[in-house]
Amino acid sequence: MSGFMLDTDISSYIIKRRPATLVAKFKQNAETLSVSVMTAAELRFGAEKAGRPGLTELVEEYLERINILDWTSEVTVPYGRIRAELERAGKPMGSMDLLIASHAVSQGMTLVTNNLKHFSNVPGLKVEVWS
């Protein structure tokens, strides 16, 4: 599979701010866009935690319009390799970011983020910044 996997940071940015350039890019690439089920979980948690009226509905509307990829056992192969390499290099990564990055690698997808710093050390991960 190829295409773009949007991480939690860029997804949250799109949901909350709806910047015209990103909305246009979203529509232009709609067939090739996905999020990891881990991103869906983080977005739903964030909306519940914030308790802001209407945010949960915005998150659900976003998730209805994008393909949500399940995390399967095939993701455990790149996860194990990437985590071990990063820890050996003294560059550990946050758990959810590592799960999402591993998911993108396993699918051969480019990860789209606003936070290049979090993902720049992941071996084998293609990353783009759209903001």
Residue ranges and their predicted role:
Residues 7-8, 43, 79, 104, ...:
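Generic structural signal for small/hydrophobic residues in well-ordered secondary structure
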Residues 10-11, 75, 100, 117-118:
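Alpha-helix capping/helix-boundary segments
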Residues 67-112:
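Active-site neighborhoods of divalent-metal-dependent phosphate/nucleic-acid chemistry enzymes
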Residues 1-3, 101, 105-131:
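Acidic, PIN/NYN-like endoribonuclease modules and their adjacent C-terminal/linker elements
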Residues 7, 36, 93-94, 115-116:
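Histidine- and aromatic-rich ligand-binding microenvironments
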Residues 1-35, 45-63:
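Short, well-structured N-terminal submotif of metal-dependent ribonuclease cores
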